[in-house]
Amino acid sequence: MQSKLLLSTKLTSQGKTQLDQYFVSPPFKVMTLPAYDDAWQNGLNAMQMSSSPGLLASDLFDIEISLADDTALSLNTQAFTRVQSMNEGDYATQKTCIKLGKNSRLFYLPHPLVLHKDSSFKQTTEIEMSEQSELIYGEIVAIGRVLNGERFAFRHFASYLRISYQNRPIIADRIQWLPAKMALTSLSQMEDFSHQGSLTYVNLAKNAVEIKAMVSELQALAAEQKNMLIGVSQLNEGGLMVRVLAHRADIIQHLFERIGQVLKAQSNIV
């Protein structure tokens, strides 16, 4: 099955963000949500939904998101994405392409990805920033259905994230897991944890001193958390990354939502 989700935003004459172009093929659907108290005033809140029980062999999910100048979008998902069991040599794929217009802001936090036994999954995410644009993007992955006794029972997981500005890379993050060939429970890998999360923040309007202060604030927040291993690193330019290991998906999800609110509150864009 090949599925497509295409959405873009526009700015109304009242200065509010609305959906502009919108196209989905099954199992995708997008629902706009009521506005809530948020530091990004006049932004759009939306939920990405899916009626699929999960990705099967040869499935391709193609997601394209484009934000117009001066718009703000907070996009969440409805439920976990599950990669189902498949024959050896088969795999499912997801491709995500995001373009941010000048002065636009995006918060995108999909629900965790769950890798079932004998599954293989490849995903690529490419994000193009523009002048004064701001990005908060999170990914969470589970090593299997742990409560069913599945730990690293999948065959292959590959994830590539590339964020660029004017065709110049700001960050490239690649994850490659082959449980049959890699000691993924060793020190400096997953150890005894079952869930990994990554949250990337990019705001090229912030200087190194401002980003460093934000890193310090998030490190203090991380120190308060229990049953998680958290690292916060400053990027070479205009941003930071948070990496988390935990035993449950929901605590990473809640932490990233809280961090998102902290970062939104320090937005330089009114």
Curated annotation (Swiss-Prot):
One of its GO terms (cellular component) is cytoplasm. InterPro entries: UreD. Pfam families: UreD (PF01774). The gene is ureD. One of its GO terms (molecular function) is nickel cation binding. Belongs to the UreD family. The keyword Cytoplasm applies. Required for maturation of urease via the functional incorporation of the urease nickel metallocenter. HAMAP family: UreD. This is Urease accessory protein UreD. It comes from Actinobacillus pleuropneumoniae serotype 3 (strain JL03). UreD, UreF and UreG form a complex that acts as a GTP-hydrolysis-dependent molecular chaperone, activating the urease apoprotein by helping to assemble the nickel containing metallocenter of UreC. The UreE protein probably delivers the nickel. Keywords: Chaperone, Cytoplasm, Nickel insertion. Signal peptide: none annotated. Coiled coil: none annotated. It is found in: Cytoplasm. The keyword Lyase does not apply.
